[in-house]
Amino acid sequence: DVRARAGGRPGVTAPPFAKIIPHSDGAGVIEAVGAGVPSGRIGARVWIWNGQWQRAFGTAAQYIALPTEQAVDLPEGTSFEEGAVLGIPGLTAVHAVLGGGPVEGRRVLVSGGAGTVGRLAVQVAAASGAEVLATARGVAGLQAAQSAGAAHVFDYAADDLAEQILAATGGAPVDRIVEVEFGRNVETSARIIAERGTIAAFGSAQDMTPVVPFYPLMFKAVTIELVLVYLLSDAERRAAEGNLTGLLDKRALDVRIAEILPLTDCARAHDIVATGARAGSVLLSI
């Protein structure tokens, strides 16, 4: 949301609408329904995805009107605060980890395991039976990834990162990489990925035009999947929603909230996110 507002998306030079209410994610109660939607949905506690995707008015408001499938029932016991983080971060994490099928017994490396998406991805992978490895930076970051379920944690800036990872696995490669910085890490990824492994990349902010080691990846038949939750197919989204619901029902996800501000402090919330100095999501409340 901050990057979209600030014009930080590659190729996007101007806002698509003259007036915009920002934000894609949120949670709340359905107060009214349109034609064709069962009236029984009124009063349902829901979380929202793609609130401001290709439309002018997003979730930084008291009300939003959306297609019924974009309002997903919150599992019993899941708070609105947790639900507000499920849209982009939750769907990204669960699809990046489980979009290729079960990971039980597999080795999954999560890049940036202390970030909002990364820490959720660590939890998803661990709860799904994977051996989880994660990179982070600093004592707090490494502890955050480890507390989420990573069996092995590494400083992502280490010069010998690939060697450290392979030492931790006894020389065995990793089957799946959930990648927040594709360009920065692709050389390391090519060294540690298994044959027919997958790199599920949802970011490359530090290198937006990466040079890819094509042959090392090709001769392992590596799949590179670029994850953009806005464009998941209907089947992929239903699967991701189902996986999220199952994990929430098991209380397997710990959503970190850094700060909750009133809606009137929306600009301040953007400033907090832009500084990067936070440990969790920043929410707006009404």
Question: What does each of the following model-derived ranges do?
Answer:
Residues 6-52:
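Glycine-rich beta-strand-centered segment in the early N-terminal region that forms part
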Residues 15, 39, 47-112:
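NAD(P)H dinucleotide-binding glycine-rich loop of Rossmann-like/cofactor-binding domains
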Residues 42, 84-158:
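Mid-domain Rossmann-like dinucleotide-binding core that forms the NAD(H)/NADP(H) cofactor-binding site
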Residues 45, 107, 131, 197-198, ...:
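Short glycine-centered segments of the SAM/dcSAM-binding site in methyltransferase folds
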Residues 112-113, 181, 204:
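NAD(P)H cofactor-binding loop motif with strongest signal on the N-terminal glycine-rich segment
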Residues 160-171:
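Short amphipathic alpha-helix with an adjacent loop that forms part of the alpha/beta core around
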Residues 184-252, 286:
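Glycine-rich phosphate-binding loop and adjacent beta-alpha segment
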Residues 235-286:
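C-terminal hydrophobic helical "lid"/dimerization subdomain
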